[in-house]
C-alpha cells in the first residue's frame, strides 16, 4: 500500500535506480504520489512496468548500472523525458552472501561496481543537471545494519554500504558549491522480497524475519513504505537544511 503524500513534490523530476522491486518500487510510487515525475531504472522490464502501472508520470528505463554508458544513458533519458532532474535516488544494490574464503573476483567486482562505483559515476554524470535544479542526491542503504555490525558472509556488501555512507558525507561538502546536497537513508531489516528472489523457502523467510523482529525494539521488520516515506521527505525542498545527514530507519535495531 502506498502512503498518501501531500503533493509538495509537484513539478520535480526524480530518477530512482533499482526501481523494479522493494524499496525502489515503493520510493518511485511515493515520489509520484507526491507530485514528482519519475524515471525508474532497473535491469528487468517486467518489474519496472509493474512499478509504473497505474502511476501517471512514471517512466521506465532498462539499464545495467555496471555498463560503461549507463550513467550518461540514465541522465539523458531523464532530461529527454522531463527536461530537468531534481532528485537522484541511489537504491540499486547487489548482495551475494558467502563465506569470505569463498569470495570470487566476479562476485566482489559485481557488488563493488553496483553498490559503490555506480552511484559515484551516475552522480558525476547527473551533476550539471542536478546543479541547474539545485537538486538532491539520496542514497538508500547507507551503512545499514549490515554496514555497522559484523555478519558472517556479508563482508563485501557491508563494506560497500559503509563506503556509501562516507560518500554521502563527502558529497555534502563537495557538491555544496554546485547547490546540490546529499543525504542518506539507512534501512534496517526490511521485507523487500529479496528472500524469494534468492530462492529461499517460505519457512526460511519466515524464520529469518521472526529472528530479525525479535532483535528489533519495534518488534517487526520494516516495510518498503517505512523507508520510502523518509526518502520523499528528505528529498523535498523543505528539507534542504538536511545535508550530509543519514537517517536510520530500522525500528531501533541499531541501538541495542
PLM segments and residue spans:
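Conserved glycine-rich cofactor-binding loop
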Residues: 20-21
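A glycine/serine/threonine-rich, flexible loop-to-helix segment
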Residues: 53, 177, 189-216
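Short, small/polar-rich loop/turn modules that mediate ligand/substrate recognition or access, typified
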Residues: 89, 176, 181, 242-244
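Conserved NAD(P)H cofactor-binding loop of Rossmann-fold oxidoreductase domains
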Residues: 91-96, 252
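Substrate-binding pocket helix/loop in short-chain dehydrogenase/reductase
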Residues: 99-100, 107-112, 212
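C-terminal substrate-recognition "lid" of short-chain dehydrogenase/reductases
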Residues: 120, 129, 220-249, 254
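Catalytic loop of short-chain dehydrogenase/reductase
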Residues: 136-163, 168-177, 189
